[in-house]
Amino acid sequence: MEDFVRQCFNPMIVELAEKAMKEYGEDPKIETNKLAAICTHLEVCFMYSDFHFINEQGESIIVELGDPNALLKHRFEIIEGRDRTMAWTVVNSICNTTGAEKPKFLPDLYDYKENRFIEIGVTRREVHIYYLEKANKIKSEKTHIHIFSFTGEEMATKADYTLDEESRARIKTRLFTIRQEMASRGLWDSFRQSERGEETIEEKFEITGTMRKLADQSLPPNFSCLENFRAYVDGFEPNGYIEGKLSQMSKEVNARIEPFFKTTPRPIRLPDGPPCSQRSKFLLMDALKLSIEDPSHEGEGIPLYDAIKCMRTFFGWKEPYVVKPHEKGINPNYLLSWKQVLAELQDIENEEKIPKTKNMKKTSQLKWALGENMAPEKVDFDDCKDVSDLKQYYSDEPELRSLSSWIQNEFNKACELTDSVWIELDEIGEDVAPIEHIASMRRNYFTAEVSHCRATEYIMKGVYINTALLNASCAAMDDFQLIPMISKCRTKEGRRKTNLYGFIIKGRSHLRNDTDVVNFVSMEFSLTDPRLEPHKWEKYCVLEIGDMLLRSAIGQVSRPMFLYVRTNGTSKIKMKWGMEMRRCLLQSLQQIESMIEAESSVKEKDMTKEFFENKSETWPIGESPKGVEEGSIGKVCRTLLAKSVFNSLYASPQLEGFSAESRKLLLIVQALRDNLEPGTFDLGGLYEAVEECLINDPWVLLNASWFNSFLTHALR
């Protein structure tokens, strides 16, 4: 390697390199790779400066050798290559004459045109890793960093490369030549592997032993050791990094980073079309319960027994008829299905002993409603691959739907309080540590705020229905089992209550894969007249089945009772998540907890008690066309819970896509509000990605509308 250095580099450069090594107590004859690295670095610094001058007008010009204008001022002052004392003298002189901030470490050059010190780096590793090591060492925004690699890559602070392209190309070509020459002599591998990271003069917390091994094993794939990753993270400067990467891409990539101002974003475009319709697996605000208080009947707790007992509390049954037909369905079949349920329940009551489960007779109306024998026959691919016109099953694009007011009403209703308690506080033992005491206190306060909430009723209803349906799907695969839709709660006085919302009839359920579908028919009681918002009930056939006497301010009034019937379907994986809807409580509690933590860190003490008991304070709940809505801490708890519950009830690919893409836009707007001067490229593409998720889902359309309200008020 020593011979190579003496042949390859100018003798003056070699002499300077040897002198520098001796100054640091290193032997150039032993540490030959270090000698080669210093020579390379010196040569790059000299090439960086060569031919660059400043004319009398203060403009930067390039002057080739032999030009008569030798009296021009050099653009760059070379600091690298001088002995330390002299180098610091030059730096101090520059700082005194230009007013530049004195750097902590000796830089390599000073640029009189841009008035900044420059640190030049030449690396055998990845440019961005070396760049970040340099940035982490220097810790100064005033010193400009410019890194070159032997592979032709480069990286500079804020992607400002200082020199013209031709000058940089000269440097890159020289580095590539050095690499080729080393490789031809078998010296490159040793030279490449000998590079160490930048050493900073600061104490480091050393991780050793097992923890060190685990740390090294846990790194992202591009990093060989913890130090590289630490340097990368500490010095990461996203804007400059992105611009640097863009500049290295093919010329076909023309992504320009545009500044993002208050006037930049436009509202998200919501689709036009007929109003969206209800698509939840069970009725929400429109559900009606037949209830029994303090149940103590024989077989109490067995769903079928409970259902029959609830049905007996109602005396206003009448001959059912269709009041709102399903546009595409055979409505008489829905009517016959309900009549069959009533008849078979009557048969059970006539028996001496009521069975624990009820399998419905496989009548023509139920076979139709449950899609029996409707699935296309599956054929082995080998038996049909010779069919000439074999093609994928054709399906229409989904029809675009517009936002309808009913979904906002549903959400508002979910945030309201009911007159029942839907969750009990579990006994989980005494608190031991102080943190457990704080956790219990928060949980108790939160539970008190949400236990009466309608969203909590939806959770318990969803858990019950999905559990019962999954059990029946596994236990009675071939049967059309009748499954009562039940929930349990306590009254304000603490009395137990069992509620019946209606029935489900399950179809054949040979569910092998998580996504295999089981069909079911749902029949749910309601007092809502479907003719008021027919678009909401597009997927339903609605029957009038009785008259209910209700107490009102003017005495008893009779109201028609309806039955909402529809064919629906679900899968094992959807039922599994439905059974775990209680997680919504945890998610919203965690969101409230982060608000308490923020408050506590400001006040430097736990603020849980004050947070929940200061009834006069209001908190932001969300955006509406009127502005930022505010409410009590209880209202915040219930709103966050309702959002989480609706995310579960209306889960869909459209929601996944909208949440992921709109979050990017939200972060950009948030950065603007925090005065971080965000930049974007292809903002149109981001809007496209957001808007392609707005098709027909009511919950997604409502979220998009809320997002537009947020944009309006956030950017005022």
From Swiss-Prot:
Transcription in keyword set? no
- Which protein, by its recorded name, is this? Polymerase acidic protein
Q: How is the cofactor bound?
A: Binds 2 manganese ions per subunit.
Which organism's genome codes for this protein?
Influenza A virus (strain A/Hickox/1940 H1N1)
Positions occupied by motif Nuclear localization signal 2 (NLS2) = 184-247
Q: Is the keyword Phosphoprotein assigned to this protein?
A: yes
Q: Which domain of life is it from?
A: Viruses
Q: Which residues bind Mn(2+) 2?
A: E80, D108
Q: What is its EC number?
A: 3.1.-.-
UniProt subunit comment: Influenza RNA polymerase is composed of three subunits: PB1, PB2 and PA. Interacts (via C-terminus) with PB1 (via N-terminus).
Motif range (Nuclear localization signal 1 (NLS1)): 124-139
Please give the function described in this protein's UniProt entry: Plays an essential role in viral RNA transcription and replication by forming the heterotrimeric polymerase complex together with PB1 and PB2 subunits. The complex transcribes viral mRNAs by using a unique mechanism called cap-snatching. It consists in the hijacking and cleavage of host capped pre-mRNAs. These short capped RNAs are then used as primers for viral mRNAs. The PB2 subunit is responsible for the binding of the 5' cap of cellular pre-mRNAs which are subsequently cleaved after 10-13 nucleotides by the PA subunit that carries the endonuclease activity.
Cofactor or coenzyme needed: Mn(2+)
Provide a GO biological process annotation: viral RNA genome replication
- Entry binding sites for Mn(2+) 1: H41, D108, E119, I120
Location relative to the cell: Host cytoplasm; Host nucleus
The entry assigns this protein to a family as follows: Belongs to the influenza viruses PA family.
- List the Pfam families: Flu_PA
| Record PTM text | Phosphorylated on serines and threonines by host kinases, including human casein kinase II.
MF GO annotations: endonuclease activity; metal ion binding; RNA binding
A single Gene Ontology CC term: host cell nucleus
Question: What's in the keyword line of the UniProt record?
Answer: Cap snatching, Endonuclease, Eukaryotic host gene expression shutoff by virus, Eukaryotic host transcription shutoff by virus, Host cytoplasm, Host gene expression shutoff by virus, Host nucleus, Host-virus interaction, Hydrolase, Inhibition of host RNA polymerase II by virus, Manganese, Metal-binding, Nuclease, Phosphoprotein
